[in-house]
């Protein structure tokens, strides 16, 4: 078993939200998107929520573990793996990135890792006949996917 870094849930979620979509996490948990918001901010809201409990924390850790493991198997490629257990479904690189963007906050990759802007990324997704990702971009995207997966596997959220 790996050694995990314990991080309080109210610190971990904003950090993780930079990399992955919390909407995907709440969908995996079968909760509404506002569930996390109400749990995090219950002291400042008129809500019946009492914040996170042990069951919530356990569920979040399980989801982060599943997402992390699946991201480690996910790779963007001109020759897709066709493995059902990845996030990169689709024949073309833009299709694979679109399916991956349901889980990952793509600005984390194209701004933070590639140093590009939204227009650069959007052009390559919307008009792949004209604009392409080069091999270096694909390699850096795949490294970022691995990094996110490893980070998710290395943390344990706590109360």
Regions found by a protein language model. Name each.
Residues 24, 118-122, 145:
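Tyrosine-centered aromatic motifs in long, intrinsically disordered, low-complexity repeat arrays
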Residues 30, 115, 148-159:
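Short amphipathic alpha-helical segments
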Residues 32-52, 117-133:
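Recognition helix of helix-turn-helix/homeodomain-like DNA-binding domains
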Residues 1-22, 77-104:
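A short, Lys/Arg-rich alpha-helix, primarily the initiator
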Residues 20-29, 105-114:
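Short alpha-helical "recognition helix" segments of helix-turn-helix
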Residues 52-72, 135-154:
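DNA major-groove recognition helix of helix-turn-helix/homeodomain DNA-binding modules
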Residues 29, 40, 61, 113-114, ...:
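A general structural motif at alpha-helix termini
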Residues 68-86, 154-159:
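Short amphipathic recognition helices of helix-turn-helix/homeodomain-type DNA-binding modules
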């Amino acid at each position: 078993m790996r050694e995990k870094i314990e991080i309080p849930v109210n610190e971990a979620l904003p950090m993780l939200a930079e990399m992955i979509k919390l909407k995907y996490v709440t969908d995996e948990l079968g909760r509404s998107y506002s569930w996390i918001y109400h749990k995090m901010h219950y002291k400042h809201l008129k809500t019946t929520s009492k914040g996170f409990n042990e069951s919530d924390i356990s569920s979040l850790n399980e989801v982060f573990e599943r997402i992390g493991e699946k991201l480690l198997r996910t790779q963007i490629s001109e020759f897709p793996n066709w493995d059902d257990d990845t996030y990169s479904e689709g024949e073309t690189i833009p299709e694979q990135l679109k399916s991956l963007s349901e889980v990952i906050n793509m600005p984390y990759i194209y701004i933070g890792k590639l140093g590009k802007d939204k227009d650069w990324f959007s052009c390559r997704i919307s008009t792949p006949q004209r604009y392409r990702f080069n091999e270096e971009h694909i390699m850096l995207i795949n490294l970022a996917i691995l990094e996110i997966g490893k980070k998710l596997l290395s943390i344990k959220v706590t109360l």
